[in-house]
Every structure is written in C-alpha cells, then in structure tokens.
C-alpha cells in the first residue's frame, strides 16, 4: 500500500490538475465550446485515474485490516457518499451534504429496534411477574386448603375419640349399676330361721324402700341404655360414612372393584368391632384365622363364637345398611358406566348394552342369594354342636356370616352368572365377544347382594319384565324414553326393595308398543354361544334347560 501511495505522490497528478484548472479558468471565455469540453474531459480522465489509484489503495488498506477492521468506516463514509453521488448523478444535481446518509438511516432503524426490543422485554417481565404472583397465590391457597383439611380431620378424629370415651364411661357406669343391683338382690346364704322371724317386720319397710330404689335405678339404667344405643347408632353411621368415603377415594385411584368391595367389607367389620367390643375381639380372631385360607370351613372357628347381645344385630345393621346402599348407588353411577364403556367397544347398539348389564345385575342377585343360602346351611351344620338347645342360634349363625364375609367365593358366583347369561335368549350378542369383560362388575354386584342378605330384613331387587306397566314409584324414566308411554320397553337398572317398600328407584325405558316389540325380539333371538368357562362339548340340553329354585321375587322370570 505504501508503494502505491508513493507512486501517486511522485506523479504529481493533483498538482498538474490544479495548473490545468487555473489555465482553463483564464482561457475559458476565449476558448470555443469544443476546447472547453476537451479541457473538462481531460480533467475527468485525470480525476478518474487518480480515483482508480485511490480505490486501489483503499482496497489494499481494507485487506490489510482483515475481515472486521474498517467495516464501520466504509459504512459510515464510503456508502453514504456513493449513495449521495449516485442520487445526485441520476437527478442531475450537485452533491449536497445535507442529504441524510445511510449511516443515519441505519442508526435510526437501530434505535427503533432497540426501543421495540426494550418495550417487549418490559412487557415480558410484567407478564412473568404476574404469573409468579398468580403461582404464589395458588400455592398459598393450596397450603390453606391443606391446613383446613388437616384441621377437619383432627376435629373428626377428636370427636370420634370423645364419643368412644363417653361410650366407655357409660359402659363402666352400667356395669357398676348392674353389679350393685345384683349384689342387692342376691339372697343371703347363712341366715338362721330365728333372725328371719325376728327381722321380718324390719325387712318389710326396708324391702319397700329397696323396691323403690331398685325401680329408680332400673329407670336410670334404661336411660343409660337408651343413651348408649343412640351413641352406638351415631358411631355406626359415622363409621359407615367414613368407610364409604374411603372406598370412593380408593376407587378414584383406579383399583379393581373386587379390591374395593373387600376394603369396604373390612371397614364395615372394623366399624362394627368398635361399636361392639365383646364380639369384635372374636371377629378379629376369626378373620385372622381365616385370612390364610379363603376356602376354610366354618367349623374351624366354632369354639370362638359367642352369643351376641340383643341389640348387636340391630346396631350393626344400621351401619351396614347405609354402607350397602352407598355401594349399590356407586355401582349404578360408576361401575355400570364403566361396564357400558367396555361393551360399547364391541357393540354399537346402546339398547343391547343396557339389556346385558341389567340381566347381569339380576342374575348376580339371584346367584348371590343362592350362595348365601348354601353358606348359611353350612354354618348351621358347623355351629349346631356348640349351640344345642340355645335360643340365640340363628343370631349366632348370622353374626358368624357377617364377621366372615370374606369367605364368600365370589369368583364361583361370577362363573355361574356368566353361564346363565350365555343361555339367556334376550341377549343378541356377537359370538366373538365374551361376557368375561363384565367379570369385575358382576363380582361387585354379587358381593353387594350377598352382604344385603345379612340385613334384617334383607334387601333385594324388584322383579321386572318387559312390557309391564310402568310404575312411577319403582322406576324413573330414561332420558330417551317416551314419557307418555304406559309400558316398559326394557329395564336399565333394577329397583331396590325392603320387603314391599322401595328404597332406591331403578331406571327403565318406556316406549309405545313395548310389549309387542319385546315379544318379537324374544322370538327372533338366537341362542348364545357358551362362555369358555363352560365348554361346548360338556354342555348339553340338560344345562340349557336346567331348573333353579327361584326366589319369590324372581319366580315370574322365564328360565331357558
């Protein structure tokens, strides 16, 4: 670069150019137009040569600066000059220094971008702070909710403990009063006949006083017993509600219905053992003895069974009835819908799905009642030697069944229900799909029905037939029903009965002409292919036309 600059200085082109300009200025008026043009062109050529040399020096200097040096200088000096020169040349105007350069434009755009960027950053910071505040608020609300829940749990536990403590105190007072009453009414063992004769007159007024005191004490004892029964009923109901809530929370974590039913049965037995301390210890010992083997015989625990108190079955029946009603309601609202979802994967028709679930529920109740009868017969045979001539034999049998509900073989009942459904002519079902899909639902219904037979009086479902007159006291109409139709087209869910009283309404679909449609559907239906549980090769006509001993509620249902 230094050599090129030295050559440019040595040629003295700029000095000669200055001389030519001065000569041209002196002779401009005397020269012709051609001569002035020649002078101008010579100067332009000379300036172009000098510019070429200067651009060469500029290129060399820029190369010596590397990739990044000199970039800002070129942008700030060369590019604006070129822009102004080309603009002036295109417009035919001289170069004006007041025209904004590219550098100014770049600076303005850079400032605008920085302002926009700062504005966006501030907006993002504000949004981030708002989100953080909301998150902190949610965390505070969550902490407060947890504290409130913990306080509620503590209060409920304290109230339960206080109730149990009060019950224990009442029991102690009752025992003391009974002991005093027995000691007062106990006859003296060694009394001479002389003292009896001499003290008769003294004993008569004392006996009258004692009778009055005994009556007052008896009234107090009756009051204490009433209070005790009331507290036991309240504790039983609270324990049942607690077990129901625990069962719902465990089902929301998606366990199987079988495990839910077992957990509920254990929770009922625990609440029952709290309300009855004497028999509770025996029931826990029986459950520990039988937990090792589900198929153990009832005779293994005959020696541990004791006669229950008169109020025991009544008190426990209140809690168990509330829990079973809640389980039956949950089966309708949750387990039934889950079973419908499973069947709708294979069946498109909603009517067929609802018929299948209703028939499964009816068959499950029938099989569970039969299993309860057989189980009760076995318990009677096992307990007969130890309760010969006892008046509390039936209470002892029922108490043993209540304490050992886990001995019920629900899987065998599920297999029986599936066999009965396979030969039911009302179900038109694809042969490639099996009713084993409903095993969990059927098992839950069987466990509920079996436990309902231990109540006094037992609970059962109402008899329902297609084409019957719709009873508003037993059923509610489904959403897709014809609300003016008087006949039932088909049943969705059975009604729950206690003797002749309706406890829970069922659900039915009503349509006009339901009776004739149901008759046609029965005549057109083909027989079902049997479940893999019962192979075809072993099932003959005797299995299909088998007879059962129907319950009074199911005596009108046809059997095929």
From Swiss-Prot:
Keywords: Coiled coil, Cytoplasm, Lipid-binding, Membrane, Mitochondrion, Mitochondrion outer membrane, Phosphoprotein
Residue spans of biased composition, Low complexity class: 248-262
Biased segments, Basic and acidic residues type: 181-209
Ranges of biased composition (kind: Basic residues): 263-293
Biased composition range(s): Polar residues: 300-310
Cellular component aspect of the GO annotation: cytoplasm; cytosol; intracellular membrane-bounded organelle; mitochondrial matrix; mitochondrial outer membrane; mitochondrion
Annotated localization: Cytoplasm, Cytosol; Mitochondrion outer membrane; Mitochondrion matrix
Coiled-coil stretches noted in the UniProt entry, renumbered to this chain: 118-186, 223-248
Modified residues (Phosphoserine): 13, 85, 156, 159, 307, 309, 531
GO molecular function ontology, one term from the record: cardiolipin binding
An individual GO BP term: mitophagy by internal vacuole formation
Residues covered by region (Disordered): 178-217, 243-316
InterPro entries, A to Z: MIEAP (IPR026169), MIEAP_C (IPR031981)
Pfam families recorded: MIEAP
Region: Interaction with YWHAG/14-3-3 protein gamma, residue numbers: 1-294
Family to which this protein belongs: Belongs to the MIEAP family.
Summary of the function given for this chain in its UniProt record: Key regulator of mitochondrial quality that mediates the repairing or degradation of unhealthy mitochondria in response to mitochondrial damage. Mediator of mitochondrial protein catabolic process (also named MALM) by mediating the degradation of damaged proteins inside mitochondria by promoting the accumulation in the mitochondrial matrix of hydrolases that are characteristic of the lysosomal lumen.
Subunit: Interacts (via coiled-coil domains) with BNIP3L (via BH3 domain). Interacts (via coiled-coil domains) with BNIP3 (via BH3 domain). Interacts with YWHAG/14-3-3 protein gamma; a protein that also plays a role in MALM.
Protein name: Mitochondria-eating protein
Species the sequence originates in: Sus scrofa (Pig)
């Amino acid at each position: 670069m230094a050599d090129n600059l030295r050559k440019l200085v040595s040629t003295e082109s700029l000095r000669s150019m200055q001389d030519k300009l001065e000569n041209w200025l002196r002779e401009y008026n005397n020269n012709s137009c051609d001569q002035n043009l020649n002078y101008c062109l010579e100067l332009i050529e000379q300036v172009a040569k000098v510019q070429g040399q200067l651009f060469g020096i500029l290129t060399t200097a820029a190369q010596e600066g590397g990739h990044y040096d000199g970039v800002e200088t070129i942008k700030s000096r060369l590019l604006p000059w070129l822009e102004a020169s080309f603009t002036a040349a295109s417009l035919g105007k001289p170069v004006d220094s007041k025209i904004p350069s590219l550098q100014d434009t770049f600076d303005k755009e850079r400032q605008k971008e920085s302002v926009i960027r700062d504005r966006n950053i501030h907006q993002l910071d504000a949004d981030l702070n708002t989100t953080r505040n909301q998150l902190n608020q949610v965390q505070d609300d969550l902490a407060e909710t947890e504290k409130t829940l913990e306080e509620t749990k503590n209060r409920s536990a304290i109230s339960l403990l206080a109730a149990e403590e009060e019950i224990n105190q009442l029991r102690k007072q009752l025992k003391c009063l009974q002991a005093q009453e027995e000691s007062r009414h106990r006859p003296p063992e060694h009394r001479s006949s002389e003292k009896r004769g001499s003290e008769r007159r003294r004993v008569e007024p004392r006996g009258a006083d004692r009778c009055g005191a005994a009556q007052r004490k008896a009234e107090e004892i009756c009051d204490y017993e009433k209070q005790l029964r009331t507290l036991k009923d309240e504790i039983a109901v609270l324990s049942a509600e607690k077990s129901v809530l625990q069962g719902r929370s465990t089902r929301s974590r998606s366990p199987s219905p079988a495990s839910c039913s077992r957990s509920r049965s254990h929770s009922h037995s625990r609440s029952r053992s709290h309300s009855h301390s004497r028999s509770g210890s025996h029931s826990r010992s029986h459950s520990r003895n039988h937990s090792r083997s589900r198929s153990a015989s009832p005779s293994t625990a005959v020696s541990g069974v004791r006669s229950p108190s008169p109020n025991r079955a009544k008190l426990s029946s209140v809690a168990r009835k509330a829990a079973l009603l809640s389980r039956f309601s949950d089966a309708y609202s949750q387990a039934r819908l889950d079973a419908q979802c499973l069947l709708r994967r294979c069946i498109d028709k909603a009517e067929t799905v609802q018929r299948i679930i209703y028939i499964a529920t009816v068959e499950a109740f029938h099989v569970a009642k039969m299993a309860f009868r057989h189980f009760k017969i076995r318990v009677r045979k096992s307990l007969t030697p130890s309760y010969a001539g006892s008046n509390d034999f039936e209470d002892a049998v029922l108490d043993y069944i209540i304490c050992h509900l886990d001995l019920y073989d629900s899987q065998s009942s599920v297999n029986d229900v599936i066999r009965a459904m396979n030969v039911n002519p009302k179900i038109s079902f694809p042969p490639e799909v099996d009713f084993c899909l409903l095993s969990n639902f059927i098992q839950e219904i069987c466990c509920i029905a079996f436990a309902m037979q231990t109540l006094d009086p037992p609970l059962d479902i109402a008899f329902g037939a297609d084409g019957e007159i719709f009873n508003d006291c037993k059923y509610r109409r489904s959403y897709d029903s014809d609300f003016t139709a008087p006949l039932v087209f088909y049943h969705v869910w059975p009604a729950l009965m206690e003797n002749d009283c309706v406890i829970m309404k069922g659900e039915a679909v009503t349509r006009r002409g339901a009776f004739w449609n149901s008759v046609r559907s029965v005549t057109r239906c083909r027989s079902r292919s049997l479940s893999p549980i019962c192979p075809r090769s072993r099932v003959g006509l005797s299995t299909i036309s088998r007879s059962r001993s129907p319950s009074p509620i199911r005596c009108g249902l046809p059997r095929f």
